[in-house]
UniProtKB/Swiss-Prot annotation:
The keyword Nucleotide-binding applies. Its cofactor is Mg(2+). GO terms for cellular component: cytoplasm. The gene is ndk. Keywords: ATP-binding, Cytoplasm, Kinase, Magnesium, Metal-binding, Nucleotide metabolism, Nucleotide-binding, Phosphoprotein, Transferase. GO terms for molecular function: ATP binding; metal ion binding; nucleoside diphosphate kinase activity. This is Nucleoside diphosphate kinase. It catalyses: a 2'-deoxyribonucleoside 5'-diphosphate + ATP = a 2'-deoxyribonucleoside 5'-triphosphate + ADP; a ribonucleoside 5'-diphosphate + ATP = a ribonucleoside 5'-triphosphate + ADP. Its EC number is 2.7.4.6. The active site is at H115 (pros-phosphohistidine intermediate). Major role in the synthesis of nucleoside triphosphates other than ATP. The ATP gamma phosphate is transferred to the NDP beta phosphate via a ping-pong mechanism, using a phosphorylated active-site intermediate. Its main location: cytoplasm. Homotetramer.
Length: 137
């Protein structure tokens, strides 16, 4: 079994669609091994997204991610990283395949509902950024 990391972003929490996202996650066969609702500080968002610090969207991304609560999740499934990325869909909801979370629930490239690890290395950084080993079941 592989683990991946997911965030239900502030736009989804604000629109009260977190339950719809969680239904899709469980419906796709993922086991939720860690979950909590948190309100990131801008500094915490900057630490999490440090790999993008030189990108022009970095400041706006960190401001967005810290504007309201998020739900962070550790997910488990065979080939979890690829499976979660497929379920999320393309970053821009306009380009995402029908039936994906971002196509069906995303608003824009900025407010695209969910985040997911893009590699085993990312998951290895992202999961412990938010969860201690005692918080994962």
């Amino acid at each position: 079994m592989e683990r991946t990391f997911a965030i239900i972003k502030p736009d989804a929490v604000e629109r009260n669609i977190s339950g719809k996202v969680l239904d899709r996650i469980e419906g796709a066969g993922f086991k939720i091994v860690g979950m909590k609702k948190i309100h990131l500080t801008k500094k915490e968002a900057e630490g999490f997204y440090y790999v993008h610090k030189e990108r022009p969207f970095f400041n706006d991304l960190c401001t967005f991610m810290s504007r309201n609560p998020v739900i962070v999740l550790a997910l488990e499934k065979d080939n979890a990283i690829a499976a979660w990325r497929e379920l999320m869909g393309a970053t821009n909801p306009a380009n995402a395949d029908a039936g994906t979370i971002r196509k069906d629930l995303g608003v824009s490239i900025e407010e695209n509902t969910v985040h997911g690890s893009d590699s085993p290395e990312s998951a290895a950084f992202e999961i412990p950024y938010f969860f201690s080993s005692l918080e994962l079941v």
